[in-house]
Structures are given as structure tokens and as C-alpha cells.
């Protein structure tokens, strides 16, 4: 089953939005298989955003993600990477669907409350950065048979 990495950024944690955001993933039938509240250090932040090194927003993004705890999560489900992207909405909340997570809670492009993997390959890389294999739970979720054929 496909997995994706989701991070609730410092603004989501500080604004008390964690429960509301998790509820949206659960309501769509996604299965939570890993979660931790954590502080991101410089090395991890730089690894996470390595593809943006050299861009003007790299350093401010690294500093921001280290500024307060984040909630790192792994969700599992059918086409969960694409589903999560749809739930999150456009990166810039000004362009996001009003019903999406960013459309509902995001303040601006840098305070957009959530990060999600943009592909299966990115999900695998990001999950490996934040979780050891034994930290992910493999279980049968009650009611799974009602979610898809």
C-alpha cells in the first residue's frame, strides 16, 4: 500500500491545528502508520530541503522549520500521495481551494501549516529521513473494507 510523508509545520503546532488536520486525513480514509512530535535540527532540515539549496528561500525555510516543534507523520492508503496533495491544496494559500487545509488555515506561502511529499519517490526519501522502519506500524484498520473495493 502506498505511503506518504506529512509534516505539520511550526505554525500548525503553535496555532493548535494538529487535531483538525489529522481529522481531515482520517475522514478521507487514510491510515496513520507513524507519528511523532519532534524538534528538527539543522542537519535534518538541510537534508529535507536539500533540493532547494542555493535558492533564496532555502535558509529562511530551514530556520523556520527549526523554530518550533513539528508533527511528522506517515499516512498509508490507495493513491495516498495524490490524495494528500489534494487535501493540502496549493502551496500558496492564496491560490488554494478554500476547503483545503492550506485554504482553510494557511496564512501565506511560508506559513502554510503543512508539508506533504510530492511523489512516491519523495515520500520514500522523506519517510526515511524522519522514521526508522520499526517506528512504522503495520496493522489492519477497523472498517478498511468500507473504504474501497
From Swiss-Prot:
EC class, as a word, reads transferase
Look up the EC number in the record and give it. 2.7.4.6
Protein's recorded name: Nucleoside diphosphate kinase
Q: What is this protein's function?
A: Major role in the synthesis of nucleoside triphosphates other than ATP. The ATP gamma phosphate is transferred to the NDP beta phosphate via a ping-pong mechanism, using a phosphorylated active-site intermediate.
What superkingdom does the record give?
A: Bacteria
The record's listing under SUPFAM superfamilies reads: Nucleoside diphosphate kinase, NDK (SSF54919)
State the family named in the UniProt similarity comment for this chain. Answer: Belongs to the NDK family.
> Mind naming one GO cellular-component term on file for this protein?
cytoplasm
Disulfide-bond pairs as recorded: none
One example of the protein's molecular function in GO is: nucleoside diphosphate kinase activity
Q: Which cofactor(s) are needed, names only?
A: Mg(2+)
Query: PROSITE patterns this protein is in?
Result: NDPK, NDPK_LIKE
Active-site annotation: 115 (pros-phosphohistidine intermediate)
Main localisation: cytoplasm
* Residues the record lists as binding ATP: 9, 57, 85, 91, 102, 112
Q: CDD domains from the entry?
A: NDPk_I
Catalyzed reaction equations = a 2'-deoxyribonucleoside 5'-diphosphate + ATP = a 2'-deoxyribonucleoside 5'-triphosphate + ADP; a ribonucleoside 5'-diphosphate + ATP = a ribonucleoside 5'-triphosphate + ADP
Q: Where in the cell is it found?
A: Cytoplasm
Q: Which InterPro entries match?
A: NDK-like_dom, NDK-like_dom_sf, Nucleoside_diP_kinase, Nucleoside_diP_kinase_AS
Q: Name one GO biological process term.
A: UTP biosynthetic process
Which of UniProt's keywords are assigned here? ATP-binding, Cytoplasm, Kinase, Magnesium, Metal-binding, Nucleotide metabolism, Nucleotide-binding, Phosphoprotein, Transferase
- Gene this protein is translated from: ndk
Amino acid at each position: 500500500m502506498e505511503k506518504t510523508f506529512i509534516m505539520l509545520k511550526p505554525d500548525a503546532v503553535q496555532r493548535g491545528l494538529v487535531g483538525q488536520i489529522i481529522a481531515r486525513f482520517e475522514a478521507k480514509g487514510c491510515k496513520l502508520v507513524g507519528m511523532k512530535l519532534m524538534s528538527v535540527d539543522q542537519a535534518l532540515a538541510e537534508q529535507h530541503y536539500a533540493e532547494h539549496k542555493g535558492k533564496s528561500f532555502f535558509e529562511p525555510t530551514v530556520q523556520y522549520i527549526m523554530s518550533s516543534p513539528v508533527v511528522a507523520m506517515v499516512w498509508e492508503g490507495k493513491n495516498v500521495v495524490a490524495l494528500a496533495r489534494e487535501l493540502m491544496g496549493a502551496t500558496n494559500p492564496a491560490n488554494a481551494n478554500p476547503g483545503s487545509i492550506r485554504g482553510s488555515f494557511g496564512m501565506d506561502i511560508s506559513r502554510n501549516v503543512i508539508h506533504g511529499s510530492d511523489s512516491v519517490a519523495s515520500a520514500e526519501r522523506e519517510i526515511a529521513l524522519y522514521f526508522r522502519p520499526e517506528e512504522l506500524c503495520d496493522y489492519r484498520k477497523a472498517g478498511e473494507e468500507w473504504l474501497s473495493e
